[in-house]
Amino acid sequence: MAAPVMSALGRLQGLIRTERSLLTHVQSRCIQTTSVCLKNRAARVRVGKGDKPVTYEAAHPPHYIAHRKGWLSQHTGNLDGEGGAAERTIEDVFIRRFIFGTFHGCLANEIVIKRRANLLIICAIFIRKMPTQKFYFLIGYTETLLSFLYKCPVKLEVQTVEEKVIYKYL
């Protein structure tokens, strides 16, 4: 009779030890203390050895917006009493990604998106990497598709340059 009680007691103690070790294992796995989670990222290009070419937009940090550089999206959604700022931001992200994918490797600078009443104007500077006919086709394709998606007229204002315009080296 004593043997079954001792074996049951031993099994119970073993179960408690196993539960404690599982509990400490689970608790230690829930806390993530990796250095990757603690990194901060600056929204500017860091100054290096002076061999990194940057454009005018990238050379100035974000706190110079409206002083030395302009807004990349111009609309009235952020005025007091106006709604739809979040929707316009999502639309701007889609437009930027769409144009980056359509004109892959040809963007020389950031895209500026302007909204005037019902008209959507997209200003871009491209590098001449493709034949002119292909540029004209892609511009018409982009205007037509975005006009169909957003149910408003879309106009692309395009300039082309031979190579990427470098403002300075950081």
Swiss-Prot record:
Keywords: Mitochondrion, Ribonucleoprotein, Ribosomal protein, Transit peptide
Chief localization: mitochondrion
Protein's cellular compartments: Mitochondrion
A GO cellular-component term linked to this record: mitochondrial small ribosomal subunit
Pfam families: MRP-S24
InterPro entries referenced in this protein's UniProt entry, alphabetically: Ribosomal_uS3m
One GO-annotated biological process of the protein: mitochondrial translation
GO molecular function annotation: structural constituent of ribosome
Transit peptide range per the UniProt entry: 1-30
Domain of life: Eukaryota
Quaternary structure and interacting proteins, as annotated: Component of the mitochondrial ribosome small subunit (28S) which comprises a 12S rRNA and about 30 distinct proteins.
Family: Belongs to the universal ribosomal protein uS3 family.
UniProt-listed PANTHER family: MITOCHONDRIAL 28S RIBOSOMAL PROTEIN S24, SMALL RIBOSOMAL SUBUNIT PROTEIN US3M
Protein name, entry field: Small ribosomal subunit protein uS3mA
Organism: Xenopus laevis (African clawed frog)
Name of the coding gene: mrps24-a
